[in-house]
């Protein structure tokens, strides 16, 4: 997505959202976003979270480049492009972008890229911690992720107990 600073200089914002829990993973503004910057963002996210299985993107020039395609092939990431003119194929990202535009880009007049990124970081934190999603049972991305982790831990604990009980010798009664 794009906007402009108060001096008219154009900026681009790259948003990366986790499809599972709608968490904003990357919200960053630059004067331009060539594919090298997208790759650098993915490399930073790889260090923090590991590699994604799939990335769904629109058909912007930064996403249709050979460099990004080659990077994804090397890393074993499925790079999926939505059909041109069908933003509904990426509806939750479009909704995210609408909230971001309303809450950040339309709400402030920025004088520098640094100012944009300071607000981006604050907004991303608030969004992940406090923004409820109907698809997540009206939980924030953070609350949903915590609930999911607890369920996984509980499920693994139950499985471990079941395995232990199946492996313990059977009790027999002698007469």
Predicted regions and their residues:
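Hydrophobic "anchor" residues
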Residues: 23-24
